[in-house]
Amino acid sequence: MLALPWIHLALLSFGYGLALTYGHLGWLAGISVALLLTAGFAARQQHVRIGRYLGHALFIFMALALAMHWLPGFYNGRGINPQRFTDDAVRFSMYLNLDKPLIGFWLLLVCPWIVGQRSLRLGIFATAMGLTLSALLALGGALLLGVISWAPKWPDQAWLWLFNNLLLVTLVEEALFRGYIQGGLSRHLKHLPYGENLALLLASLLFGLAHLAAGWQWVLLATLAGVGYGLAYRFGGLAAAIATHFGLNLLHFGLFTYPMLAG
């Protein structure tokens, strides 16, 4: 049995504690927790194969519902009120979510294999490679499409944005898209000659489609960025994918229009 990824769990728990200082949980949130526990028990047991499949199916449904904020009992606090970080940017606001991080807790506790432990040296190399590629593809593409421009800044709310993005956004998204989806597909497609490449591309495409509400440009850019994150995960594990994703978000936030140009 794989050891639990305590460092990842500790970081996510710290972020969740930060979110609780801005929002709160209602008793109805207990229903979601109970369903996740049921899914986890079913997915972890080894006696009934169909039970494992049903457990993962229930988790996928819950992950979608939590990510879309469909479930009751979660009162997410707003950490940043609507404002423009630069005069030419669209207004940005930020909530510290209490529902979406439960996806990360479930994955780290039920599927610790998603971590893909690698050496520190390999992780650093994979992060540097993934970040360089994703920055060239995604930020370069965003500049070419005219959705961002050069706009270096460090607003007063930057530190809160940083903690939220690292602990509650990037960690959870990479655990889901790279660890669970790419890692799971890689395991099931390993008999194919290009199974790992196909898993990476499918996970990147799903990650891009998750940004559909922002427009086709962001679907394309997120898909391209996902290729860099996926390579970081393949060679450096979950920590490298998180570092790559967060590094790109930090470059976008600190050096370019955030979140995008108005109009």
Regions of interest found by a model, annotated:
Residues M1-S119, F253, T257-G263:
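N-terminal, membrane-interfacial amphipathic/helix-forming hydrophobic leader that caps
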Residues R49-G55, L122-A128, G195:
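Membrane-interfacial entry segments at the cytosolic side of transmembrane helices
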Residues F74-V169, R187:
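Juxtamembrane helix-loop-helix connectors linking adjacent transmembrane helices
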Residues T132, L136-G263:
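Transmembrane helix-loop-helix hairpins at the membrane interface
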